[in-house]
A protein has these predicted regions:
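Canonical Rossmann dinucleotide-binding motif of NAD(H)/NADP(H)-dependent dehydrogenases/reductases
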Residues: 2-32
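The beta1-alpha1 cofactor-binding region of Rossmann-like NAD(H)/NADP(H)-dependent oxidoreductases
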Residues: 39-40, 55-67, 102
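Catalytic Tyr-X3-Lys loop
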Residues: 87, 98-118, 142, 166
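Conserved mid-core segment of classical short-chain dehydrogenase/reductases
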Residues: 88-106, 129-135, 155-158
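Active-site helix of classical SDR
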Residues: 120, 162, 170
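Alpha-helical segment proximal to the catalytic Tyr-Lys
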Residues: 125, 175-176
C-alpha cells in the first residue's frame, strides 16, 4: 500500500519505535496522527513532521474513541494503524520483596494487549467505513509483538505474556479482516 496522502495513526508515538514509525510514515507522505499518553512529547514530534499529536490512554475505551475521532476529524478515517504503545517493566515473579504484585502484571496486559486490541477495533471500523482503493485494499493494521513472546527472559513474564497475546490475536484478526481488504500483521522486534 502506498501510504502517500492516507491517514495514519501511530500509538506510542512520543518515543522509540512509535516515534520512528511516525517519522517514516510522514516522510512517505502519510497524514500522521501521533497518539500517546505523553501528548507534550508527541506534540514536539508532530510539529517536526507535520502531524497532529493527540493524548490517548490506549487502555481506556473512552480515551481511544476520542483520540480516533480527533484523528478522523483532522485527517479523515484511518487507512493505516501502527500500534507501538507498550510498557516493559522488568519484574521477577518472586523478588526480594515477595511475589510480584498482580497489578503490575495486569497493567502490562492492559497496555500491551488490551490497548492494542482497543485501537485495532476502532481503526478497523474506520477502514471498513471506506470504499476500497483501486488495489482492493481498505487499510493495514500493524501490531507490535516482540521476540520475547517466543523467547522471554527472566523478569519478563508479564511482558512476554502480553506480546504473546498480541501475536496470537493477530492471526485470527488477519483472517477476519482479509475478506474486507484490511491486512493485519504483527512485527516482533528484538
Amino acid at each position: 500500500m502506498d501510504v502517500k496522502g492516507h491517514a495514519a495513526i501511530v500509538t506510542g508515538a512520543a518515543s522509540g519505535l512509535g516515534a520512528a514509525t511516525a517519522r517514516a510514515l510522514a516522510a512517505k507522505g502519510a497524514k500522521v496522527s501521533l497518539l500517546d499518553l505523553n501528548a507534550e512529547d508527541a506534540g514536539a514530534l508532530a510539529d517536526d513532521i507535520g502531524g497532529v499529536a493527540i493524548g490517548c490512554d490506549v487502555t481506556s475505551a473512552e480515551s481511544a474513541e476520542e483520540a480516533v475521532k480527533a484523528a478522523r476529524d483532522r485527517h479523515g478515517p484511518a487507512r493505516i494503524l501502527v500500534s507501538c504503545a507498550g510498557i516493559a517493566p522488568p519484574k521477577r515473579i518472586v523478588g526480594r520483596d515477595g511475589p510480584q504484585p498482580l497489578e503490575t502484571f495486569s497493567n502490562v496486559i492492559r497496555v500491551n494487549l488490551i490497548g492494542t486490541f482497543n485501537l485495532l477495533r476502532l481503526a478497523a471500523a474506520d477502514m471498513l467505513s471506506q470504499d476500497p482503493l483501486e488495489t482492493g485494499e481498505r487499510g493495514v493494521i500493524i501490531n507490535t509483538a516482540s521476540v520475547a513472546a517466543f523467547d522471554g527472559q527472566i523478569g519478563q513474564s508479564a511482558y512476554a505474556a502480553s506480546k504473546g497475546g498480541v501475536a496470537a490475536m493477530t492471526l485470527p484478526a488477519a483472517r477476519e479482516m482479509a475478506k474486507s481488504g484490511v491486512r493485519v500483521l504483527a512485527i516482533a522486534p528484538g
